[in-house]
Amino acid sequence: MKNLRTAIAFPFLLAACLLLPACGGNTKKDKNMHAFEKGTFGYDLYYLSGKDSLIVLKGENGNAQIIVSAKYQGKVFTSTATGLSGKSLGFVNYKVFDSGVIDEHMNGYGGENRFWLGPEGGKYSVYFEPGVEQVFDNWHTPKPIDIEAWNILFSGEKETILEKAMQVNNYLGTALHLNVIRKITLLERDAAYRMLGIAANPNLNLVAYSTNNTIFNKDDFEWTSQTGTICIWMLDMFNPAPRAVTIIPFVEGKEKESGKIVTSDYFGEIPADRLSIQGNAIYLKTDGNYRSKLGLNEKRAKEIAGNYDPDSQRLTITTFNVDKNAVYLNQEWNPAKDPLKGDAMNAYNDGPLADGSIMGPFLEVESVSPAAFLKPGQGLSHIHNVFHFIGEEADLNLVAQQLLGVSIEEIMNIF
């Protein structure tokens, strides 16, 4: 990591070289933004340029691009596989930006890949103050992962590295000090296909990137089950669609040895017309109309999940680390639960709350690192990668079969 420090003196110059000059003024931004339809990457690019001096990582032909923001916690806000006029593949929450209001609980700006810390709830929670009831009124996202800017250590054409020193306080009353290093790398086509272990298909458009996220214990004490600890929590926010479905392959096995296949009652049990288990895959309807969340433990989770939307001809694949022998933290809002038994991955579909309000709508695919039982100075890394394929159904079908073990026809006939 020592080489990272050489970039500190000039990160903003490098970042500025990469992208449009946000300093050019709102008039130019508005003019350029309205040259593109809402929902396109070009629209979001110019919209977000009015909020931050963005970092844009680009592929060789300019079709594959991703937007990264240091001001907004090192998020990958959105991406495109087909250039400026192509579909914006991440969820951008315009209404939160446009409100200008800072919410005390969470500021849901969006972002198709964001760094968070867990656990959200439970004995080790870093979202609730000690002793309070774990209900929404008392839930507060730690500011370093919600509203504080991060530092740029390095920015190049296809890679950027960001850093944030932070303190989080847990439900036990322990103050944890850590440093986060987040490296985001745009993958060229050949590298992306090699990473997935499948043959390249020239008929498909593709944007892919890898994120390597590391936390370091900066305290003078070890993080243990007595002090409480944290985990890395990666969340991808994508746009829902009427026929979109999340697909999660799982490891088969007896419940006695591997635990139940899926935890599906986070917000009440998910109805059968929205959640289905067929063969060795779990299917979740992601239309943005019904709030639902599921999770898989480390013995059930494979290192892959997907989401398919036939209307936008998009198949998204996420890959991530899973350690079958590690401890994962419980994130439920219940301090009575065992804090050392939790999920390794989750999926979410947004929907209206009881009062009719809604944050999105959006869908999420999430992955979690093992518990960070770290001695002073030790680090823990978690890798989470995103691949968006755009193309005809027949070509996407090959990818789905090879990576998810199911066909597009099976996905479309589940619900």
Briefly describe each language-model feature range.
Residues K28-E60:
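Short, Gly/Pro- and small/polar-rich lid/capping loops
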Residues A70, K164, R182-I184, Q378-G391:
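Short, hydrophobic/aromatic-enriched beta-strand segments in well-ordered soluble domains
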Residues Q401-F415:
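Short peripheral tails and domain-boundary helices/loops at the edges of structured domains
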Residues S53-I66, A70-F128, K218-Q378, E393-L404:
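A contiguous, surface-exposed recognition patch within enzymatic or periplasmic domains that forms
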Residues T27, H34-E37, L45, E129-L206, ...:
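Extended, loop-rich substrate-binding clefts of extracytoplasmic carbohydrate-active enzymes
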Residues T214-I215, V386:
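Hydrophobic beta-strand positions in extracellular immunoglobulin-like domains
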Residues L20-A22:
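C-terminal motif of bacterial Sec signal peptides marking the signal peptidase cleavage site
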Residues K2-P11:
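Bacterial N-terminal signal peptides that target proteins for export
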